């Protein structure tokens, strides 16, 4: 019954994630699913952490697995990670954060300016983090369209004019 519930859970997650990200998540899931039964269980996690040189105790591993409301199949794995990837900020909150730097209200910012802010303020992004963040970002003529970007990362697909 639990496995059936896991199969039904959050199938709309497939519509929310870009195809490339979904493929990367599938590869990650397959690497973790050591026994290839289509579900990640405590033994799969033990083997994965062992291969990384870590040995978390069963309590930690059980806590990780409890984030899923049922057995951890690929759909549930995607759902959990898409929630984590999308974070807790709403699309409007993110858009408003970018808008603070958009004095002329053009809905676009100079991409070099944004990169400079991210490299030198707050979390201090590395060059690799920067490349990954802006890999599929809507940038035209050096201008970063933050309205499209926030819609893209939050999965709404809505773009304001």
Curated annotation (Swiss-Prot):
Listed InterPro entries: EF-hand-dom_pair (IPR011992), EF_Hand_1_Ca_BS (IPR018247), EF_hand_dom (IPR002048), Myosin_RLC (IPR050403)
GO CC terms in record: myosin complex
UniProt-listed PROSITE patterns: EF_HAND_1 (PS00018), EF_HAND_2 (PS50222)
Modified residues (Blocked amino end (Ala)): 1
Residue ranges annotated for the EF-hand domain, each copy included: 20-55, 89-124
Keyword Metal-binding: yes
Keyword Metal-binding applies: yes
SUPFAM superfamilies assigned to the protein according to its UniProt record, in alphabetical order: EF-hand
GO molecular function: calcium ion binding
Coiled-coil region: none
Keyword terms: Calcium, Metal-binding, Motor protein, Muscle protein, Myosin, Repeat
Highest taxon of source: Eukaryota
Pfam families membership: EF-hand_7 (PF13499)
Binding, Ca(2+): 33, 35, 37, 44
Note: Smooth muscle myosin from the scallop adductor muscle contains two kinds of RLC proteins, A and B. Because RLCA hydrolyzes ATP and superprecipitates more slowly than RLCB, myosins containing RLCA are thought to induce the catch mechanism, a tonic contraction characterizing smooth muscle that is maintained with very slow ATP hydrolysis. The calcium affinity of the smooth muscle RLC is approximately 10 times that of the RLC of striated muscle.
UniProt xrefs under PANTHER family: MYOSIN REGULATORY LIGHT CHAIN 2 (PTHR23049)
Its biological purpose: In molluscan muscle, calcium regulation is associated with myosin rather than with actin. Muscle myosin contains two types of light chains: the catalytic light chain, essential for ATPase activity, and the regulatory light chain, a calcium-binding protein responsible for Ca(2+) dependent binding and Ca(2+) dependent Mg-ATPase activity.
Protein name listed in UniProt: Myosin regulatory light chain A, smooth adductor muscle
The organism of origin for this protein: Mizuhopecten yessoensis
């Amino acid at each position: 019954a639990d496995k059936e519930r896991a199969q039904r859970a959050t199938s709309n997650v497939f519509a929310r994630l870009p195809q490339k990200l979904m493929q990367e998540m599938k590869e990650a899931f397959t690497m973790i699913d050591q026994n290839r039964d289509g579900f990640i269980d405590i033994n799969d996690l033990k083997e994965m952490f062992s291969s990384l040189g870590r040995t978390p105790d069963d309590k930690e591993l059980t806590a990780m697995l409890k984030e899923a409301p049922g057995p951890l199949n690929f759909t549930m794995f995607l759902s959990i990670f898409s929630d984590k990837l999308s974070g807790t900020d709403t699309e409007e909150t993110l858009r408003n954060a970018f808008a603070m730097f958009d004095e002329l209200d053009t809905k676009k910012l100079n991409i070099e300016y944004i990169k400079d802010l991210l490299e030198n303020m707050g979390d201090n992004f590395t060059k690799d983090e920067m490349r990954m963040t802006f890999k599929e970002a809507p940038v035209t003529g050096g201008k970063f369209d933050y309205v499209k970007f926030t819609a893209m990362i939050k999965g709404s697909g809505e773009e304001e004019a």
